[in-house]
Amino acid sequence: MPQLNPKPWFMILFFSWVIFLTIIPTKIINHIQPNDPTQVDAKEHKNDTWNWPW
């Protein structure tokens, strides 16, 4: 019964985990943050107070 021979199944399992642990995480990391964030220029906003006569 060839399905009981562990040698080919072990290689399939091993190579599938190698692909899972090496190739897939790098592809996921590249899609999480594809570009480096750029800092937006910090501008002070003009905050005028309202002088309402109460």
Curated annotation (Swiss-Prot):
Bilayer topology annotation: Single-pass membrane protein
Any GO BP: proton motive force-driven ATP synthesis
UniProt keyword Transport present: yes
Cellular localisation: Mitochondrion membrane
One GO cellular component, as annotated: mitochondrial membrane
UniProt main location, coarse: mitochondrion
Region described as Disordered: spans on this chain: 35-54
Transmembrane feature ranges: 9-29
GO molecular function, a single term: proton transmembrane transporter activity
Alphabetical list of Pfam families matching this protein: ATP-synt_8
Keyword Ion transport in annotation: yes
Keywords noted in UniProt: ATP synthesis, CF(0), Hydrogen ion transport, Ion transport, Membrane, Mitochondrion, Transmembrane, Transmembrane helix, Transport
Function: Subunit 8, of the mitochondrial membrane ATP synthase complex (F(1)F(0) ATP synthase or Complex V) that produces ATP from ADP in the presence of a proton gradient across the membrane which is generated by electron transport complexes of the respiratory chain. ATP synthase complex consist of a soluble F(1) head domain - the catalytic core - and a membrane F(1) domain - the membrane proton channel. These two domains are linked by a central stalk rotating inside the F(1) region and a stationary peripheral stalk.
UniProt family annotation: Belongs to the ATPase protein 8 family.
Record's subunit section: Component of the ATP synthase complex composed at least of ATP5F1A/subunit alpha, ATP5F1B/subunit beta, ATP5MC1/subunit c (homooctomer), MT-ATP6/subunit a, MT-ATP8/subunit 8, ATP5ME/subunit e, ATP5MF/subunit f, ATP5MG/subunit g, ATP5MK/subunit k, ATP5MJ/subunit j, ATP5F1C/subunit gamma, ATP5F1D/subunit delta, ATP5F1E/subunit epsilon, ATP5PF/subunit F6, ATP5PB/subunit b, ATP5PD/subunit d, ATP5PO/subunit OSCP.
Protein's name in the database: ATP synthase F(0) complex subunit 8
Gene that specifies this protein: mt-atp8
